[in-house]
Amino acid sequence: MTRVLGIDPGSRVTGYGILDWTGKPVLVAAGCIRTETDDFPERLRRIFEGISRIVEEFRPEEMAVEQVFMHKNADSALKLGQARGAAICAGVAHGLPVHEYAARQVKLALVGKGSADKAQVQHMVCFLLGQAGPLALDASDALGVAFCHLHHRQTLSRMSRMVRR
């Protein structure tokens, strides 16, 4: 069994999702870390501590994080990058290997279309997990990152077995 923590970073809301892989994906936990303050360094601390608590509680083996895409607003891109850095530091501080995926790569792995919108990602995550009701958008995005990583791991594993033959 492999347990993966997926992260959808944000400076105000950071989504997280944890999946176990036992031959099929199993939802362990999903939610959002809401920083709820205007003080930016405090937001980063809350992201770091929130991810740390999640790692300590659920003990994932690997972490997958969505990469920053270029914003039209440079300040927003910088803040997003710093929030992402806080999440990555929390994972690394707990000894997790961290894997990064572009948003387009995540959407392509889940929906089959790199330009899919958040609602399409949310729908596919719920469908794949057999969820009746929708998850929060940030949480479903984080689960999408975890799905993408599991898919990537499976592909590499299959290729490795083929090469050894």
UniProtKB/Swiss-Prot annotation:
Q: Which GO-annotated molecular functions does the record name?
A: crossover junction DNA endonuclease activity; DNA binding; magnesium ion binding
E.C. number(s) listed in UniProt: 3.1.21.10
Q: How is the cofactor bound?
A: Binds 2 Mg(2+) ion per subunit.
Q: Which residues bind Mg(2+) 2?
A: 66
| Swiss-Prot/TrEMBL GO biological process terms | DNA recombination; DNA repair
Q: Which cysteines are joined by disulfide bonds?
A: none
Q: Which reaction does it catalyse?
A: Endonucleolytic cleavage at a junction such as a reciprocal single-stranded crossover between two homologous DNA duplexes (Holliday junction)
What function is annotated for this protein?
A: The RuvA-RuvB-RuvC complex processes Holliday junction (HJ) DNA during genetic recombination and DNA repair. Endonuclease that resolves HJ intermediates. Cleaves cruciform DNA by making single-stranded nicks across the HJ at symmetrical positions within the homologous arms, yielding a 5'-phosphate and a 3'-hydroxyl group; requires a central core of homology in the junction. The consensus cleavage sequence is 5'-(A/T)TT(C/G)-3'. Cleavage occurs on the 3'-side of the TT dinucleotide at the point of strand exchange.
Q: Which family does it belong to?
A: Belongs to the RuvC family.
* Protein name stated in the entry: Crossover junction endodeoxyribonuclease RuvC
Organism whose genome encodes this protein: Methylococcus capsulatus (strain ATCC 33009 / NCIMB 11132 / Bath)
Lineage of origin: Bacteria, Pseudomonadati, Pseudomonadota, Gammaproteobacteria, Methylococcales
